[in-house]
Swiss-Prot record:
GO terms for biological process: 'de novo' AMP biosynthetic process; IMP metabolic process. The active site is at residues 14, 42. The gene is purA. Substrate binds at residues 300-306. SMART domains: Adenylsucc_synt (SM00788). GTP binds at residues 13-19, 41-43, 306, 332-334, 415-417. InterPro entries: Adenylosuccin_syn_GTP-bd (IPR018220), Adenylosuccin_syn_Lys_AS (IPR033128), Adenylosuccinate_synth_dom1 (IPR042109), Adenylosuccinate_synth_dom2 (IPR042110), Adenylosuccinate_synth_dom3 (IPR042111), Adenylosuccinate_synthetase (IPR001114), P-loop_NTPase (IPR027417). HAMAP family: Adenylosucc_synth. The lineage of its organism: Bacteria, Pseudomonadati, Pseudomonadota, Gammaproteobacteria, Legionellales. Keywords: Cytoplasm, GTP-binding, Ligase, Magnesium, Metal-binding, Nucleotide-binding, Purine biosynthesis. This is Adenylosuccinate synthetase. The keyword S-adenosyl-L-methionine does not apply.
Length: 431
């Protein structure tokens, strides 16, 4: 009997999910992307070669894994085909092992133009999107006007819908944002080319997944971004436009909740965030700079520097509750090597001195909150590439043990470097 495992980020994304998914695919036959778009990059380093995947599931680097892009993903055909060709240039046969849902909403050039125009228009109040059209594409989906992958294969219907949509969006672009219009004829021509390339890879993903399940195959669901970028449960409005929590697997892949066996939450040994929004444990001093430099904290897709701070157990506790997380994987422990003192936020304090054990639900409610820290001694020895728990420095083990105690959940995996083998597995999700 196969197992169905979900891997998701418990913070603001960039937790190192790509490497862990790649590692776990040694035990999986199927890997599924179920939400988001090409706004988040999963970085893998195998035999010293770095690969950044944006849309294609990380399992593609394993030769016997079938990969699916499910209906919860907003799909840029241009970005996907570019990524496919990049991987094919490295000798990876993508098209035989990649399947795409007919129900994926399309990201088209007018979505990207709208995204960038809005961010520019908002100035200092901008959310800090990646400018890749994700939000506008999800808006079209919710407004029930989106063009989907399946529409590409009905030329006349697609052309009629595209004409209507472009008329609507071009009005906003030209009249409100004072930006150039997107050309209909050139977009229609591109779309016909995309249709021919995508046609062999499309299917009813939900139906395929249930066939894999019935055959007893292991299925791995690969989340993008992190819990606190969730449109409902994140630090709204500084969030993404999709649901990033485990419930998104059910809707975004058409996979029933009782079929999920294990949820692995990925967290860094510290905290990072890209773009605007609250960040209670953010470090603006030399320690924060040191963590950023050692951790090479720059966005895989945008190259933007990430904000860095101490481990926030208040946020993690809520992530665990929201996602019924079975176990944690802590990444980038080696980045903390050499620090004299480490801090874990165990609560927040408001301006009146009241102690809060849970995070607020809205971004503005984080204003004036200060973290309440617990201090632990650091370690001077290297944890890089350690593969046995007992070989870690005593203070590193104590730090991890304290995280387990505070959160009330086991650390099942530990990443000590970017390579596949730089991992300690205490309990494998597929076991």
């Amino acid at each position: 009997m196969g197992k169905n495992v979900v891997v998701l980020g418990t913070q603001w994304g960039d937790e190192g999910k790509g490497k862990i998914v790649d590692l776990l695919t040694q035990d999986a036959q199927v890997v599924v992307r179920y939400q988001g778009g090409h706004n988040a990059g999963h970085t893998l380093k195998i035999n010293g070669v770095k690969t950044v995947l944006r849309l294609i599931p990380s399992g593609m680097l394993r030769p016997n894994v079938t990969c699916y892009i499910a209906n919860g993903v907003v799909l840029s055909p241009q970005a996907l085909l570019s990524e496919i060709k990049e991987l094919e240039g490295n000798g990876i046969n993508v098209r035989e092992r990649l399947r795409i849902s007919l129900a994926c909403p399309l990201i088209l050039p007018y979505h990207i133009a709208l995204d960038k125009a809005r961010e520019t228009h908002m100035g200092k109040s901008a959310i800090g999107t990646t400018g890749r059209g994700i939000g506008p594409a999800y808006e079209d989906k919710v407004a029930r006007r989106a063009l989907r992958v399946g529409d590409l294969f009905h030329r006349d219907r697609f052309a009629n819908k595209l004409t209507e949509l472009l008329d609507y969006h071009n009005f906003v672009l030209t009249q409100y944002f004072k930006q150039p219009a997107v050309d209909l004829e050139s977009l229609l021509g591109e779309s016909l080319q995309w249709a021919e390339e995508l046609r062999p890879m499309v299917c009813d993903v939900s139906a395929c997944l249930h066939e894999h399940r019935k055959q007893g195959e292991n299925i791995l669901f690969e989340g993008a971004q992190g819990v606190y970028l969730d449109i409902d449960h994140g630090t709204y409005p500084y969030v993404t436009s999709s649901n990033t929590c485990v419930g998104s697997v059910i809707n975004g892949a058409g996979f029933g909740p009782r079929y999920i066996d294990y949820v692995l939450g990925i967290t860094k040994a510290y905290t990072t965030r890209v773009g605007g929004g609250p960040f209670p444990t953010e470090l603006l001093d030399d320690v924060g700079k040191r963590i950023a430099e050692r951790g090479q904290e720059f966005g895989a897709v945008t190259g933007r520097p990430r904000r860095c701070g101490w481990f926030d157990a208040v946020l993690l506790k809520r992530s665990i509750e929201l996602n019924s997380i079975s176990g944690l994987c802590v990444t980038k422990l080696d980045v903390l090597d050499g620090l004299e003192v480490l801090r874990i936020a165990v609560a927040y304090k408001d301006r009146d001195g009241n102690i809060l054990s849970r995070p607020p639900l809205a971004a503005d409610d984080f204003n004036d909150l200060l973290p309440v820290y617990e201090e632990l001694p650091g370690w001077q020895e290297s944890t890089a590439d350690v593969t046995v728990m007992s070989d870690l420095p005593a203070n590193a083990r104590a730090y991890l043990k304290r995280i387990e105690e505070i959160l009330g959940i086991p650390i099942d995996m530990l990443s000590t470097g970017p390579e596949r083998d730089s991992t300690i597995t205490l309990r494998g999700p597929f076991l």
